[in-house]
Amino acid sequence: MQRAEPQEFSRVLSSMCTEPHPAAREAAERFLATNPGDPGTYETVSKLEREAVDMLGEVAGLPDAAGYIASGGTEANIQAVRIARNRADTRTPNFVAPASAHFSFRKAADILGVELRTAPLEDYRANLDGVAELIDSDTALVVGVAGTTEYGRVDPIPALADMAADAGALCHVDAAWGGFVLPFTEHAWDFDDADIHTMTIDPHKMGQAAVPAGGLLARGPELLDELAIDTPYLESTSQVTLTGTRSGAGVASAAAVMDELWRDGYRQQYETAQTNAHWLAAEVESRGFDVVDPVLPIVAMDLPYDLVADLRERGWRLSRTEADEARIVCMPHVTRSMLEEFLTDLDRLA
């Protein structure tokens, strides 16, 4: 059988995952054979999961956080909608999310039979008037995004939380990517800033954990109780997670890397990434291309379709926004020298 080699990150510019930190790699290898879905049997990894959730709570301004390490942001977003649906006192629940929300919310609506109402944007953020027009007595959840996938924008989270409260709905924040950069900014986004109920925050993105290591946080355990089912043949009696068997490697890597990097390591990582994003935006703009201001370390640029195709032929992994801009995410593996090499190819091909 031919031996397959993992893809190098040397030309990966659009991914929101990155090379795991050495501490994450080592921990993941040690816990490959463990299953936090059976905490009675795998007690050590269960304790590590509790530590990981506690640290995620510290990152997101939530002491004594409830939650668990999920497969990724999609699972966490689905679970947040599921909590809201199960808690709602209506037979026809809906939830409101901005047009910038991740496509996983469309999956959630389809799987759970909950109507998704999509609010318009203003300067790439949720338009509050548009959200208000969509909320009614059947609204179970209002979603805000803290670090949008395409542009890195942060919705007005406190205002969205207030609107949810007025409607008797829950408020969920999707900070899958932004959660490990926003603590070092002035944005209001977390449990300490607003009366939000649940949050998606992924260690395997800017947290540098090994995949799979997403995160779901809840303000209290009673919210997770909405997800509980009996597990009669396990040593534990109930389960709130979406999947049964889960990756102990992901859990261990998340706990290890957060212990290693929070807080100063992540601060330095953010400052480097943000500096690189601003530098890249200025360089691309100086070449005559329109660029969306990188509020967080994501650069969207109006490169012609054929030029992006040529860059991809040279091995650069670039994605495009819905508006057809090229998009670069300044992840920890995206160095200044890597960006300089990208610009060299851009100049040759433009």
UniProtKB/Swiss-Prot annotation:
Keywords linked to the UniProt accession: Decarboxylase, Lyase, Pyridoxal phosphate
GO molecular function, one term: aspartate 1-decarboxylase activity
Listed EC numbers: 4.1.1.11
Signal peptide: none
Pathway(s) where this gene product acts: Cofactor biosynthesis; coenzyme A biosynthesis
Keyword Lyase: yes
Pfam families: Pyridoxal_deC
Modification N6-(pyridoxal phosphate)lysine, positions: 205
Cofactor: pyridoxal 5'-phosphate
Any GO BP annotation: carboxylic acid metabolic process
Superkingdom of this protein's organism: Archaea
Reactions the enzyme catalyzes: L-aspartate + H(+) = beta-alanine + CO2
Protein family (similarity comment): Belongs to the group II decarboxylase family. MfnA subfamily.
Function field: Catalyzes the decarboxylation of L-aspartate to produce beta-alanine.
HAMAP family noted in UniProt: MfnA_decarbox
Name of the molecule in the record: Probable L-aspartate decarboxylase
Gene it is expressed from: mfnA
